[in-house]
Amino acid sequence: MGGVIHSDDKNLYFSSGNTDKILYQMDLKKDKISKLKLKEINPQQILPYKNKLFVTHCDLTSGMGKAISLLNPQTGESKVYKFKHNVIQCQTKEDYLYILSNDSIYKYKFDGEKMHLEASSKIAIKGFWKNGYISSFFLK
């Protein structure tokens, strides 16, 4: 298992790290694991958003993947958001979604239904090593 883990008061969510379309949900009181089917492959990062979960879809080896699912874990329903850029990592803050791609960072306003691009910026670091890349970020 090489995926990412998220937990709340009742459940632990994790992916296998494989190219499947499955997110696993473990009921912490019953020690029961169930599968939540997704519409996209490569589930990676799992972020809480209100009573739902954002799930990024990216092959971290190639840096390719342009989708994020918004999953309702109670019903199993999900909606896929497709982007013109790769989704390497993302963070949420209030109703904003910040997405790191291969060479840029994007700020989207999420109104519960649609993603609205508010800003984007290319990442250029002087003196950066020749074959290096930005692999993560955090919000304060």
Indicate where each model-derived feature is located.
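Repeated scaffold domains used in trafficking and secretory/extracellular systems
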Residues: M1-D9, L38-K50, F83-D95, I125-K140
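Structural motif
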Residues: D20-Q25, S62-S69, S104-K109
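Surface loops and adjacent helix of pleckstrin homology
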Residues: V4, G17, C58, N102-D103, ...
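Residue position within the beta-strands of beta-propeller blades
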Residues: F14, V55-H57, I99
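Short loop/turn segments that connect beta-strands within the blades of beta-propeller domains
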Residues: D8-D9, S16-T19, K29, Y49, ...
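Blade-level signature of beta-propeller repeat domains, shared across WD40, Kelch, NHL, RCC1
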Residues: L100-K140
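Short loop/turn segments that connect beta-strands within beta-propeller blades
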Residues: M26-D31, L71-G76, K109-E113
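A short beta-strand motif characteristic of beta-propeller blades
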Residues: D31-L38, G76-K82, H116-G127
